[in-house]
Design a protein with these regions (language model features):
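Basic, amphipathic alpha-helical/coil surface patches used to engage anionic, phosphate-bearing ligands
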Residues: 1-120
Length: 120
């Protein structure tokens, strides 16, 4: 799993970001992520999954800092939103500002960042 994770980041930094930079005519060095949490449940977060997520977050922060431009989680269940309210208190304000957790009311927020014709 982690080899694919690192491969993805290395591909972003060494190939995709430079290609996007050339095409846009300006520096592109971060990504915009939309995560649909429709099928997420609290039982999905086993201790093994939590451990892997923690390790991934640590490695990402150490080796690929500031690569997150924005992340919007849509259809987040209440339990996830409640946990986020606690967790974000332990994170840097700059990081928190890049993450939006939304329930089924996500469309207005999403359209603040993405043109409607670019969404499925």
């Amino acid at each position: 799993m982690f080899s694919n994770y690192f491969y993805t980041f290395e591909t972003l930094f060494n190939h995709k970001y430079p290609a996007c930079t050339a095409k846009a005519g300006r520096r592109i060095d971060s990504s915009f992520n939309i995560i649909d949490m429709t099928d997420f449940s609290a039982t999905s977060l086993t201790s093994q999954v939590r451990g892997l997520l923690g390790k991934a977050a640590g490695v990402t922060g150490d080796n690929y800092p500031e690569c997150l431009g924005m992340m919007i989680c849509t259809n987040a269940p209440f339990v996830f939103s409640a946990c986020w309210k606690i967790v974000k208190g332990f994170l840097d304000e700059r990081t928190v500002s890049k993450i939006k957790i939304k329930g089924s009311d996500y469309k207005k927020t999403l359209l603040e960042y993405v043109d409607a014709d670019k969404l499925p």
